[in-house]
């Protein structure tokens, strides 16, 4: 029985990419800087001491990081019996965003430039917002700027609730984000507004419109909910997910995977919110999975809760929780199964600002007849997609070199 389980640790980079200078990210290292802060006692909120990831270390995480940066992260070394194949990958895609990383690892790099709203204030063209408002039956909106999602709620959440004006904002990514209160504005109304925005953005080449529903009564109590939706453009070519689906296989999305791929190549969607629930849902879907199935989970909290918010201790806590549950996944694997752990970009919680960082990502592969040891530097995330295609004996992808023979 052939099954692939992909666990995407959203934003868990292992050191600056070869082209990090073009992004202002030379020296960024999500994993390494978290480990360093833990070793120095600077990440003791809700945990303490060195970063403890024994199961990820056995899969080769520390070794992959050393190959990427030239040194082991603090607290990691070669005194571990590695049971998996490990490597690190550079990105071909032009951006350091979520769709680019996900699509490329599924065999389809983004070799064109996304559109961006680069102005920090007055970020959106008035012609665009006028059309969105007119179609939605609204007259005004709030925001029109770059912001972190939690900051803008404290700044504008009360005014939004009082006036009913939606909050439009963006970031360094190719996104148009809309935040609205679930109760005072309404969840379905927010989704309808996002669909309108998605349609009106067709000429702007924006990767995603993101619905950001929240609850609460005032600054300090506002909280984003698990009802986020991403309205992405479709990948520019069929991914390995599409190819497996076309061949009669099953592709199970856990969490926001389906949204990231614009629901292309997905046969089943499982909703889950939060690290614990996402892990539980992954376990359940692996138990249910039959032959020729991909179970694909995005563990978004690493990025959204801790990377962007520059919360080193929170990131470390969540990594340690994730690591503690890995034996549950390993226990479910059959001899022929293929487990793949990776990331889509970096988001170094020690880095200035609140945006993603251009980093190499870990490639931790277990099963599928792979011998334990180094896979080296992969020149593209697409090597993972090509390897999945090879594993399922699908038609080869245009990009990537398989590490499964």
Swiss-Prot record:
Binding site for Mn(2+) 2: 303, 308, 356
Family matches, as Pfam families: Metalloenzyme
SUPFAM superfamilies: Alkaline phosphatase-like, DeoB insert domain-like
Entry keyword annotation includes Transmembrane helix: no
Domain of life, source organism: Bacteria
Family: Belongs to the phosphopentomutase family.
The protein's name: Phosphopentomutase
